[in-house]
Every structure is written in structure tokens, then in C-alpha cells.
Swiss-Prot record:
GO terms for molecular function: structural constituent of ribosome. This is Large ribosomal subunit protein bL34. One of its GO terms (biological process) is translation. Belongs to the bacterial ribosomal protein bL34 family. It comes from the Bacteria. PANTHER family: LARGE RIBOSOMAL SUBUNIT PROTEIN BL34M (PTHR14503:SF4), MITOCHONDRIAL RIBOSOMAL PROTEIN 34 FAMILY MEMBER (PTHR14503). It holds the Pfam family Ribosomal_L34. Keywords: Ribonucleoprotein, Ribosomal protein. One of its GO terms (cellular component) is ribosome.
Length: 51
């Protein structure tokens, strides 16, 4: 049986990346909440670039 999580960096960044979050009002709310909480990584885009 094929597993459900088939990682792809491109898909991950397009769906959960910083620019994707900035596109919608809800996404901007997520970012503002994470800033208020003091998160070091706001989005998955903030992880170390390996590619």
C-alpha cells in the first residue's frame, strides 16, 4: 500500500509557503498570530534551503 505522505518541496512551498500565506486574508492572519507568539519560523519557507 502506498503511504499518504509523499514529500515534495515544491508542493509544500506552494501550499504553505510565505507567498501563499500572504495571498489570502486568512493566511495573513496566520502570519500575524505566529509573529505575536514569537515564532522563529513563520512558514515552511523559513526552513533551511537545501535545493
Amino acid at each position: 500500500m502506498k503511504r499518504t505522505y509523499q514529500p515534495s518541496r515544491v508542493k509544500r512551498n506552494r501550499k504553505f509557503g510565505f507567498r501563499a500565506r500572504m495571498k489570502t486574508k486568512g493566511g495573513r492572519l496566520i502570519l500575524s498570530r505566529r509573529r505575536a507568539k514569537g515564532r522563529i519560523k513563520l512558514t515552511v519557507s523559513d526552513e533551511k534551503k537545501k535545493y
